[in-house]
């Protein structure tokens, strides 16, 4: 990582900084997307194992999920979601429980294995 040290008085500093996406903010947003019937677009999505697992979990529930080469994720929830979250997917990451609130809000019933 580059580091810049600025000494003394300066008139102004300006520029652009690229911030990498964070898994810990992306997973709750993916889970919350279940609440929306329109498409949800997430940009700068980190392609780490938990994000891919959550993508597969959403697909298993009935969502359509696309990820572009520019790390933009499009989630579509036009059809009703299944009420049962597959144990195989939930058991590989703790973030699977994040879907509970969204599924309860959308369908008033949910089954999850813990």
Specify the residue positions occupied by each region the protein language model found:
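Short, structured segments at the rim of ligand-binding sites
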Residues: 1-114
């Amino acid at each position: 990582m580059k580091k810049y040290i600025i000494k003394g008085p300066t008139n102004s500093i300006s520029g652009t900084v690229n911030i990498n996406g964070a898994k810990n903010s992306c997973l709750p947003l993916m889970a919350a997307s279940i609440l929306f019937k329109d498409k949800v677009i997430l940009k700068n999505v980190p392609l780490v194992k938990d994000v891919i697992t959550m993508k597969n979990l959403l697909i298993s529930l009935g969502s359509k999920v696309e990820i572009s080469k520019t790390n933009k994720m499009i989630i579509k929830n036009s059809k009703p979601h299944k009420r049962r979250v597959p144990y195989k997917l939930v058991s590989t990451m703790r973030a699977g429980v994040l879907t509970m609130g969204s599924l309860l809000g959308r369908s008033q019933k949910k089954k999850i294995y813990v």
